[in-house]
Amino acid sequence: AAGVVTCGATGAVLVCSIMLLGKLRGLRPILAVELKNAHGDPLLLLDCGANIDSRPELYASFAHLGDAYMKSIGYESPRISLLSNGAEDTKGCEAVKEANQLLHTLPIRFLGNIEPTAALTGTTDVIVCDGFHGNILLKSIEGVAKAVIAELEERLPDAPEAVREALSAVREKYDYNTQGGAILLGVKAPVMKGHGSATGDAVTAMLLRMATLCQNGFTERVEAACK
């Protein structure tokens, strides 16, 4: 298969994808999520949960996967950043500091570290991190958006229809399940995993994105970058 779209259970999808499709040589399968930044442009966050604790060298494969993904959806030179607790190269735990040095040596457009507060500002196209911190960032973005919008709706019960529609649009923008779902990268064909309660629109979005990845040679790009 050139690509797979499913709404099955996450664990089963991970195991079956690795067993049936096989892993790309030298890469650790990861979960990525395509979010929207404040300007409505794609922002790829990876890893989002497949690898809880990553060695510095694994960040290099994450960066290659993110670079290939963004190029496959039309970004000629995607900007890649490393999630940390400060923008300076010296910030972060030892694994992150070593990863920062390693990413600077790769043939990618690596901008350096990025703080969570800058994640959605539009200053980067790809955020690389381990699965533990990526999952926390993902759920924090979604949770804060829901909490803020819920409070606004409570404080503005008689808001005009246009305002209510705008709030609903913002809620959906920061809920990755409505944008499609998680993407398993690092196997021999990209796998997109939607939420079990995904709507028809979400499934359509996943199918269209998968078609774009396959038509633009995503897997071939990754294999070439990692040789």
Protein language model features and the residues they cover:
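Glycine/threonine-rich beta-strand-loop-alpha-helix active-site module
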Residues: 2-3, 7-58, 62
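General beta-strand structural signal in soluble alpha/beta enzymes
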Residues: 3-7, 46, 109-114, 129, ...
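Short glycine-rich or small-residue beta-strand-to-loop segments that form or flank ligand, phosphate
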Residues: 3-6, 44-51, 79-86, 190-194
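Short glycine-rich anion-binding loops that position phosphate/pyrophosphate groups of nucleotides
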Residues: 9-12, 19, 87-88, 132-135
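Buried hydrophobic packing segments
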Residues: 13-17, 63-66, 99, 203, ...
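Glycine-rich phosphate/nucleotide-binding loop
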Residues: 18-45, 123-127, 131-226
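Glycine-rich beta-alpha junction loops
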Residues: 50-52, 84-89, 116-118, 130-134, ...
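Glycine-rich phosphate/diphosphate-binding loop of Rossmann-like nucleotide-binding domains
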Residues: 52-116, 125-126
